[in-house]
């Protein structure tokens, strides 16, 4: 007497006829307009919560400074590992010149935008 595996395998001893009915308490979310509008509102609220605020200008400038220092650090490593035996003072001066050139390049690109 089971219907697709639902219900009793045998009505014997259950005090019922074993007839399987559709559950009227079940509601299909796709067909019920009351539930779909509520679900859409919840999705919109979740999307609004996931939107990230605009970044602060200080954070952006800090990241730019870190990128510049990374380039200068790589340049310093290249000078220190190079075949020329340069003193620390000359390496420092070359790194300062390189840093200035990068900063001037960034300022020129900002002024063009």
From Swiss-Prot:
UniProt domain CWF21: residue ranges: 60-105
CDD domains tied to this protein: cwf21_CWC21-like
Residue spans of biased composition, Polar residues class: 11-26
Protein location: Cytoplasm; Nucleus
Cystines in this chain: none
Matching Pfam families: cwf21
Signal peptide location: none
Listed Basic and acidic residues bias regions: 29-42
Record carries keyword Cytoplasm: yes
Alphabetical keyword list: Cytoplasm, mRNA processing, mRNA splicing, Nucleus, Spliceosome
Broad class of where this protein is predominantly found: cytoplasm
GO cellular component terms, A-Z: cytoplasm; spliceosomal complex
Subunit and partners: Associates with the NTC complex (or PRP19-associated complex). The NTC complex associates with the spliceosome after the release of the U1 and U4 snRNAs and forms the CWC spliceosome subcomplex reminiscent of a late-stage spliceosome.
Protein name: Pre-mRNA-splicing factor CWC21
Species for this entry: Kluyveromyces lactis (strain ATCC 8585 / CBS 2359 / DSM 70799 / NBRC 1267 / NRRL Y-1140 / WM37) (Yeast)
Top-level taxonomy: Eukaryota, Fungi, Dikarya, Ascomycota, Saccharomycotina
Gene: CWC21
